[in-house]
Regions:
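Extracellular/periplasm-exposed beta-strand and loop segments of Gram-negative cell-envelope proteins
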Residues: 74-84, 88-101, 130-142, 170-218, ...
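Hydrophobic, lipid-facing positions within transmembrane beta-strands of outer-membrane proteins
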Residues: 60-62, 104-110, 143-149, 216-222, ...
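Predominantly the C-terminal beta-signal and adjacent terminal strand-loop region
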Residues: 21, 291-335
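Transmembrane beta-strands of outer-membrane beta-barrel proteins
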Residues: 62-66, 119-123, 147, 161-167, ...
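Positively charged n-region of N-terminal signal peptides that target proteins for export
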Residues: 1-4, 155
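Transmembrane beta-barrel domains of Gram-negative outer membranes and organellar outer membranes
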Residues: 20-148, 153-155
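Transmembrane beta-strands of outer-membrane beta-barrel pores
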Residues: 68-72, 114, 125-131, 153, ...
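Sec/Tat signal peptide C-region and signal peptidase I cleavage site
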Residues: 12-19
């Protein structure tokens, strides 16, 4: 997760000096980014519990481990923001324009075999408290919790693979901020007072860039796997239903109106002119976007290698709705 965060921060920090921003471009850019991020959250919340065995067996079989992964959102979602803020993509990060911007995720995940019937239960949890990264070049917070129950249609034995179906629930919430990202104040061009058509200067002093997201997702999945000596390849498919995801981004800064803090009436006029999806206060300009409740579809698969009771899983996933990619690594102890 740390590597994916570093890539994202380097991407955001690749900025030069500039003086003025077109507000319409800023609004459109952040609105597009927030929409694409909210659309990609159900996919990101699926990180964890995608272990190679389609069924681990009944109790006392169990396992616990750590999963680290990332999913992508299309680069086009962020390119409008970069254009509006005068940010250029560094040449060493050109691969992002092709594969997308990585959004990291991690979980501690565990599975326990069921009693009497052939099922297993999984739980996962990931948490990065606000303030843990204080003093770094960025701030981040992260929370992911979820679980599932899988029922074995077939058990792995002889030439027969294991096949299971499962139902799960995931909730994800997080945010990232980059203080002092932009060099110097930003001017928002040509604010016109509708009362007298006079032009005024809006300026953001020492702005910081921030993003926030949350989603609640129900998931139905099926998986097939086959243990061959020390290896277990697997494939799966999932249909998820999002109850609605929310994502947003913007700038936190002191807003100045002709060089002074705006009054309540001036803020009301500014919001009237630029409002809608944008929320403007004297401390921030942010855009929030909700994705409608709906279905999402993904395929996943990978391979695990085990020595005695230690397993290493390498997995990949593809989201059909957003064309996003995902990858994860899981290290666990399982009996």
């Amino acid at each position: 997760m740390k590597r994916a965060l570093i890539v994202l921060i380097v991407l955001l920090a690749a900025t030069g000096a500039f003086a003025q921003v077109d507000f319409a471009a800023f609004e459109s850019g952040f609105e597009s980014f927030a929409q694409d991020l909210s659309n990609g959250l159900p996919f990101n919340s699926s990180t964890g519990l995608n272990w190679s065995p389609a069924y681990i067996g009944q109790f006392p079989h169990f396992g616990i481990g750590l999963t680290v992964g990332a999913t992508t959102i299309p680069y086009a979602a962020m390119s409008e923001v970069f254009t509006a803020l005068g940010i250029s993509l560094p040449s060493e990060l050109n691969f992002i324009s092709k594969y997308g911007i990585p959004i990291p995720a991690y979980t501690i995940d565990a599975r326990l075999g069921g009693f009497f019937l052939p099922f297993d239960i999984g739980l996962k949890f990931g948490y990065l408290p606000p303030g843990v990264l204080q003093g770094q070049s960025f701030t981040a917070d992260y929370f992911l919790i979820g679980g599932d129950i899988r029922y074995a249609l077939l058990k792995d034995h002889g030439f027969v693979p294991a096949i299971s179906v499962g139902l799960g629930y995931n909730y994800i919430k997080g945010g990232i901020g980059v203080p002092g990202l932009l060099s110097g104040p930003i001017q928002i061009a040509d604010f016109v007072d509708p009362r007298d058509n006079s032009k005024h200067t809006l300026e953001l002093s020492n702005p910081s860039l921030g993003m926030q997201w949350s989603a609640s997702v129900l998931e139905l999945k099926a998986q097939i796997s086959k243990k061959i000596l020390f290896f277990t390849p697997y494939l799966g498919a999932a249909v998820s239903y999002s109850f609605g995801a929310e994502a947003g981004g913007g700038l936190t800064a002191s807003l100045l109106y002709d060089g002074a803090t705006p009054s309540a009436s001036q803020l009301a006029l500014i919001n009237q002119a630029y409002g809608g999806t944008v929320n403007i206060t004297d401390q921030s300009i942010t855009v929030l976007k909700n994705s409608d409740p709906g279905f999402d579809y993904r395929a996943f698969g990978g391979l695990s290698f085990d020595i005695f009771f230690v397993y290493l899983d390498i997995g990949a996933a593809y989201d059909f709705a957003t064309s996003a990619l995902g990858a994860s690594v899981n290290l666990r102890i399982a009996l």
